[in-house]
Amino acid sequence: MTEEVKTVRDPLLVVTAPARVPTLGEDFAAYDTASVDACEAQLRRRGWRVKETANVRLMEHRFAGSDAARAAGLQEAFDEVDADVILCLRGGYGTARLLPKVDWERAGASCAAFVGLSDTTAVNCALYAVTGKASWQGPVARAFRLVNPARDAAFEAALMSETFHLKASVTGEAFNASGIFWGGNLAILTSLVGTPWFPKIDGGILYVEDVAEPAWRIERMLLQLIQAGVLTRQRALIVGGMTGADKTAGEGAGRFSLSDALAWIRREAKIPVASGLRFGHLADTLTLPFGVESDVASDGSSLTVTAYGCASPASLPWREAPPADLWWH
């Protein structure tokens, strides 16, 4: 009798770099090799095999190589047949340059779960707009150089199952809504309006985040989504981290804060708005699904999300008993 031999492989996490690289110094002239090595070492400690795409250690200006090299790196990540998860090294700027250069049908055929954030929200959008493929918004690879139990627990829990559950604190009005759960970086979303890579989603629940944008600019971007007919076609808006939004809000009668901006948007869009979700450019960011059906409810102080059909990798380190020396146990 012939005994069947099963090959067991360790889960593979592919790191790619469609935008900027981490740099050192005020002149941004040197590649921060140490931070990249540190993040990959921590990912390996969590049980991943880590593979870099060919452009990850390249540097042209502040980018991870030329536009062609970065596009090839992104395609390489999606073409890797053993990939379980794709993380981007960091955000910054430059991903949108690559959108016409990627074969999105090939990318959509990948079994890997793509995780975007910040500038790489452009990839989430293009994947869904062209192929309908679900993905994630969550931490960039470089974030893992620093231990953060809350971030890591959220990341691991999210990827475990095709059904996603979340209960989190927010502020705003009570509502119940069902629809496609999607979103990401507000500046990137608005920059894609009118392009082939912007998702056409009606009756969705849109979540947004940003960093270093004052309240008036946040309002202006949300107003663009209203006037483009995007926000008014959603059932609710969830606002995540807006780090630095009130830094230049001013004082006294002339003060204009994020809460002022969101109150105006709520009136104009005529949809419920919840704010304060721990998601975005935050050390303990949540990981959220992109492009999946969901049921969302808020009582004004807490938000409950159940999402279905999420991108759950076939192989994850924490699905099996982890080695005893892993730092999060």
Predicted feature descriptions by range:
Residues 132-194:
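Conserved anion/nucleotide-ligand pocket segment
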Residues 1-82:
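ATP/NTP phosphate-donor binding region
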Residues 241-329:
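ATP/nucleoside-binding phosphotransfer catalytic cores, i.e., glycine-rich phosphate-binding loops
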Residues 52-54, 116, 234-241, 274-276:
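Short internal beta-strands
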Residues 102-126, 134-141, 272:
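Short, acidic/small-residue loops that bind anionic groups at enzyme active sites
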Residues 85-96, 117:
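N-terminal glycine-rich "phosphate-gripper" loop used for MgATP/nucleotide binding
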Residues 11, 82, 107-113, 131-133, ...:
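A short helix->loop->beta-strand "cap" motif at the edges of active sites that frequently abuts
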Residues 200-258:
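Internal helical hairpin/lid segments
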